């Protein structure tokens, strides 16, 4: 009888033994990400890859007429550029954003926390579509993830009003729901950054509609200008940001650009370099090294532009 009992107990222990499955250390599933605030925060960092890099600020105007170059890009050569050679028609960032919004629904996370991160996602969706509209004009509006057989993969362009109205809705949601109001690093999107982007986008859209009368959208110009004004006033009155004057009129402007860290009293969102993280700027290499190859070189016109700026801003 005892043998039977021992055998039965042993069998129960074997059947109820611990699982050998381990939690992956290098990857997570969807439920793991979306059921905690930390998971939402970690996912949201992927959106920042859309923003300009450290080097974009001094490299993006390489073909402007303030500099001399040894060669020209095809996009300014007559007959050398075409739709096939164009860039920017990538939708992977949008899919990443829409996937997040669709799945940020787990009630284990407080609703206000979820809305904060959805607001952040919609901020970046507005930024994505702003960049697309500036580059291409009319584009299709897509606010969900698409399968491989989805008809929207072959969708035509939506009207400018449709797309930009959705962009404004995204910006309004972001301004209302992003909870962060201060960031000591100057590298994260805050509520005030959302208002600033809203002001910039609305100003662009109002001006575009005003001067492109062929669109037939001049009736909405004042509305978009007013949206820009209200957003800018919010930043000026409520954000706490202001022009940096901490080192006097002679040194503050220079200090703003040579500081190791963003001067967050003025700078709202920065692309940061950090030697400890091996993230370094390359401006000196770009401008002074012969090993970088053919590149933009300043001419007297640019130098005079800077000198005129100093003349107009000098307190004397």
What are the roles of these predicted feature ranges?
Residues 131, 135-138, 144, 177, ...:
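Alpha-solenoid helical repeat scaffolds
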Residues 138-161, 208-227:
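Short coil/linker segments at helix-helix boundaries
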Residues 19-71, 172-173, 188-195, 200-314:
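An aromatic- and glycine-enriched ligand-binding surface/loop that stacks and positions planar moieties
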Residues 37-41, 45, 51-53, 70-136, ...:
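Conserved, well-structured interaction surfaces
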Residues 2-8:
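Sec-dependent signal peptide recognition
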């Amino acid at each position: 009888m005892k043998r039977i009992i021992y055998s039965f107990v042993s069998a129960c222990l074997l059947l109820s033994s611990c699982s050998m499955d381990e939690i992956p250390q290098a990857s997570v599933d969807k439920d793991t990400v979306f059921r905690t605030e930390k998971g939402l925060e970690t996912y949201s960092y992927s959106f920042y890859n859309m923003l300009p890099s450290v080097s974009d600020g001094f490299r993006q105007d390489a073909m402007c007429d303030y500099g001399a170059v040894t060669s020209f890009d095809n996009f300014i050569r007559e007959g050398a550029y075409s739709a096939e050679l164009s860039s920017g028609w990538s939708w992977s960032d949008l899919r990443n954003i829409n996937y997040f919004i669709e799945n940020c629904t787990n009630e284990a996370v407080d609703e206000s926390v979820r809305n904060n991160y959805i607001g952040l996602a919609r901020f970046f969706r507005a930024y994505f579509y702003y960049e697309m509209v500036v580059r291409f004009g009319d584009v299709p509006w897509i606010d969900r993830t698409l399968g491989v057989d989805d008809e929207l993969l072959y969708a035509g362009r939506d009207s400018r009003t449709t797309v930009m109205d959705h962009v404004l809705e995204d910006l309004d949601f972001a301004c209302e729901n992003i909870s962060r109001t201060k960031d000591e690093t100057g590298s994260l999107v805050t509520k005030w950054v959302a208002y600033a982007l809203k002001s910039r986008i609305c100003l662009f859209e109002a001006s575009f509609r005003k001067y492109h009368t062929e669109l037939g959208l001049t009736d909405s110009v004042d509305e978009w200008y007013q949206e820009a004004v209200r957003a800018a006033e919010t930043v000026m009155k409520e954000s706490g940001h202001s022009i940096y004057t901490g080192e006097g009129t002679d040194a503050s402007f220079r200090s703003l650009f040579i500081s190791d860290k963003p001067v967050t009293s003025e700078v709202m969102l920065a692309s940061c370099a950090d030697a400890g993280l091996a993230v370094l700027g390359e401006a000196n290499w770009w401008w002074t090294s012969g090993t970088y190859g053919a590149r933009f070189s300043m001419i007297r016109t640019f130098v005079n532009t800077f000198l005129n700026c100093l003349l107009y801003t000098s307190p004397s």
